Swiss-Prot record:
This is Biotin synthase 2. Keywords: 2Fe-2S, 4Fe-4S, Biotin biosynthesis, Iron, Iron-sulfur, Metal-binding, S-adenosyl-L-methionine, Transferase. The lineage of its organism: Bacteria, Bacillati, Actinomycetota, Actinomycetes, Mycobacteriales. It comes from the Bacteria. Residues 48-278 form the Radical SAM core domain. It comes from Corynebacterium diphtheriae (strain ATCC 700971 / NCTC 13129 / Biotype gravis).
């Protein structure tokens, strides 16, 4: 494909034919008519992924007192004016209880999220115990988001029954030092590669509204494509008082919708997953679910309130989706 094929229709046809969109081609979509762009992204989603909708929920299994300095996060100890619940790892019984509660509501993927740079080895063993019980007693897909874990950690977690690892890139490689300097973009990449090498599927996306450019957002998605991510979460910044990003101007819903549509061109087969901040869009993400997004994190987030699982189930059904695991869930 040549760079002259830069219309929405030409790029749609190229993506559907199996050609990977280039960076310049993705950049050309920034100024495309939104309605045309969204409709094309939805057609790509329908042809490449079908009408399945992957609904997951998360549990804040260890909260607060994180030593890292991510500028958007309320759980960092670097920002002492923020009041956030802090507690150690919850019990295996509580993990099982919450997994069952979410499964009963129709959720098909349950992610265990912990604060901190990474889990200690004894904490990994504790999580493994809970996961084995969840797989035996509940029967639900289990994911983990536990920081910069090692290959040895991933082997133990995979053996226990965890199928997917989440570790957000957050933004582009170029912009990453603007939001965090206590760890690096390459630390993230190494973590995801270690999980992939262990045979686990990858969930990695980022946050819109950190002050990044559209080019940064596209570069983030291209990095995710290079990693072969199966799920690409799209968060919208909830600017929390007390963090360095407090007072940041909120993105317009149309800008988020445009980003989601462009992400679908870049990641035609991934589950593009609306995540934190969806309540800021005004329609709980409906326009984005018609612009290439085909999955969501439902319920409350880590330190912010989300949409209800029941309302999400009704919304995606009305849009013609069927709740099911994304096609690349292994």
């Amino acid at each position: 494909m040549t760079a002259t094929l830069n219309t929405v229709q030409d790029l749609e046809a190229s993506v559907l034919a199996g050609t990977a969109i280039t960076r310049d081609e993705a950049l050309s979509l920034i100024d495309a008519p939104l309605d045309e762009l969204s409709a094309a992204a939805d057609r790509i989603r329908a042809q490449m992924c079908g009408d399945g909708f992957d609904m997951c929920s998360i549990i804040n299994a260890k909260s607060g007192r994180c030593p890292e300095n991510c500028t958007f996060c309320a759980q960092s100890i670097r920002y002492p004016t923020i009041s956030v619940d802090s507690y150690p790892l919850i019990t295996a019984d509580e993990l099982v209880r919450q997994a069952q509660e979410n499964k009963d509501k129709g959720v098909i993927r349950f992610s265990i999220v912990t604060s901190g740079r990474k889990l200690r080895r004894d904490e990994v063993r504790h999580i493994c115990e809970g996961v084995r019980r969840i797989k035996q007693e509940v029967g639900i897909e289990v994911c983990i988001s536990a920081g910069l874990l090692s290959a040895e950690d991933f082997q133990a977690l995979h053996d226990a029954g965890i199928s997917r690892v989440h570790c957000n890139l957050e933004t582009s490689r170029a912009y990453f030092p603007s939001i965090c300097i206590s760890h690096t973009f390459d630390d993230k990449i190494a973590t995801l590669q270690a999980a992939r090498d262990e045979g686990m599927s990858l969930c990695s996306g980022g946050i819109l509204g950190l002050g990044e450019s559209m080019e940064d957002r596209i570069d983030m998605a291209l990095s995710a494509r290079e990693l072969g991510v199966n799920s690409f979460p799209v968060n919208v910044l909830v600017a929390i008082e007390g963090t360095p990003l407090a007072g940041t101007e909120q993105l317009r819903p149309e800008e988020v919708q445009r980003c989601v549509a462009i992400f679908r061109f870049i990641l035609p087969q991934a589950a593009i997953r609306l995540a934190g901040g969806r309540e800021l869009l005004g329609d709980d993400g409906k326009a984005c679910f018609q612009s290439g997004a085909n999955s969501a994190i439902s319920g409350d987030m880590l330190t912010t309130t989300g949409t209800t699982i029941a309302s999400d189930m009704a919304l995606v059904k009305d849009l013609g989706y069927t709740v099911t695991l994304d096609h690349s869930h292994s």
